Design a protein with these regions (language model features):
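Non-catalytic terminal/accessory segments
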Residues: 1-196
């Protein structure tokens, strides 16, 4: 990528650089991918760019975010037949890898929001695993939920996704609990590997 101050300047640069790349470096320029464009919205190695206070900044491209959401959904699917330990390991590996690659981007706000969705997916897995009313009741009690509420939620007919966002399930499978059993979350890991 070559950054210029104006479109005319970019067009002149392209005219000059193309012969150098093809005749001096013996490289072929891809006509479809070689464009003069405003920096906003351009996708490059999963990143996109924007201008803030006169300076170029990095964001994660929407397509990269969509791909990440799809992958998290796959990893938190119970149809893959993994046990909790293997799934947790796979998820943590993905969180570390994704964050280390995109740590240069401005993603704080997105990560805080996405972690809520991510934790809800994890809670849904556990709720599905508990299956029977008595099993749900036993685990809820074990995790500190009072008897009447535990019985009420254990008997709930609400769908898995909906119940995973309920106050009781959020309280029993809290952030502290999930971290305690080894889960890593995007925003926490981002803070750990970046110095702002």
């Amino acid at each position: 990528m070559i950054f210029c101050k104006s479109k005319k300047s970019a067009e002149r640069t392209l005219e000059k650089i193309q012969p150098f790349i093809e005749k001096k470096l013996y490289l072929k320029m891809n006509e479809e991918k070689t464009v003069v464009s405003y920096v906003k919205g351009v996708k490059f190695l999963g990143y996109t760019f924007y201008i803030y206070r006169g300076k170029g900044r990095l964001r994660v491209h929407p397509k990269s975010i969509a791909k990440m959401k799809k992958r998290i959904k796959e990893l938190t699917s119970r149809s893959n037949g993994w046990g909790n330990e293997k799934r947790r390991t796979k998820l943590n590996e993905y969180v570390r890898g994704w964050m280390n690659y995109f740590k240069l981007a401005d993603v704080k706000t997105f990560l805080k929001s996405f972690d809520g969705y991510y934790r809800r997916r994890i809670r849904m897995i556990y709720w599905k695993q508990w299956k029977k009313v008595r099993t749900k009741f036993r685990y809820l009690r074990k995790l500190g939920i009072e008897e009447s509420k535990a019985w009420e939620y254990a008997n709930s007919r609400k769908g898995y996704w909906r119940i995973a966002n309920s106050p009781i399930v959020n309280r029993s499978l809290s952030i502290q609990f999930l971290e305690g059993i080894g889960y890593i979350f995007f925003y926490d890991y981002y803070q750990k590997i970046t110095v702002n």
